[in-house]
Amino acid sequence: MNSKIIRFENLRSFFKDGMTIMIGGFLNCGTPTKLIDFLVNLNIKNLTIISNDTCYPNTGIGKLISNNQVKKLIASYIGSNPDTGKKLFNNELEVELSPQGTLVERIRAGGSGLGGVLTKTGLGTLIEKGKKKISINGTEYLLELPLTADVALIKGSIVDEAGNTFYKGTTKNFNPYMAMAAKTVIVEAENLVSCEKLEKEKAMTPGVLINYIVKEPA
């Protein structure tokens, strides 16, 4: 079996301007901060970022916002980062807000090859603008389109050398769903162990979905 473990400098060829990147985490809980720092140092631009939030100014995903690397953001919450709001109102950043449950279902749909998600969330609000409505048995739904990415950056609490990944507590959040929905998946391992050290029933993301593992500081 070829090793999935890779050094940060060998990831450079995977990233370029204009990419769509999913980043796991919830206000920096379960967020691959070393991989984000790596992206900041690469200074690639015009990115579309799919994430739950943009954390805080100059923290986590907020570093990408502060460094003017993001062209479009698809997220459920931006209130904790004033920089995101300023860029939105100054027309420096396109923001698509998606309710949190809808966002994760759109990601799950993308990973499962589904054509979209039907939901009543957002009906009668600004969320429905420009979206198709479908009536089923007399009930109206919004059609939310699936989300996929070129690369997903996720974080695992324990990752074995085959890529099987365990998330501790709420660090799970968006990570396992994003691992299903991208062409290339890179996991930042908090603890990297040999294959026999992680009980397979604890693997929340199977190694077959993981392309690369990083551990050392960027």
UniProtKB/Swiss-Prot annotation:
It catalyses: acetoacetate + butanoyl-CoA = acetoacetyl-CoA + butanoate; acetoacetate + acetyl-CoA = acetoacetyl-CoA + acetate. The lineage of its organism: Bacteria, Bacillati, Bacillota, Clostridia, Eubacteriales. Induction: Transcriptionally induced or derepressed before the onset of solventogenesis. This is Acetoacetyl-CoA:acetate/butyrate CoA transferase alpha subunit. NCBIfam families: pcaI_scoA_fam. SUPFAM superfamilies: NagB/RpiA/CoA transferase-like (SSF100950). The keyword Transferase applies. The acetate and butyrate conversion reactions are inhibited in vitro by physiological levels of acetone and butanol. It is an enzyme of class 2 (transferase). Shows at least 80% of maximal activity from pH 5.9 to greater than 7.8 for acetate conversion. GO terms for molecular function: butyrate-acetoacetate CoA-transferase activity; CoA-transferase activity. Keywords: Plasmid, Transferase. Belongs to the 3-oxoacid CoA-transferase subunit A family.
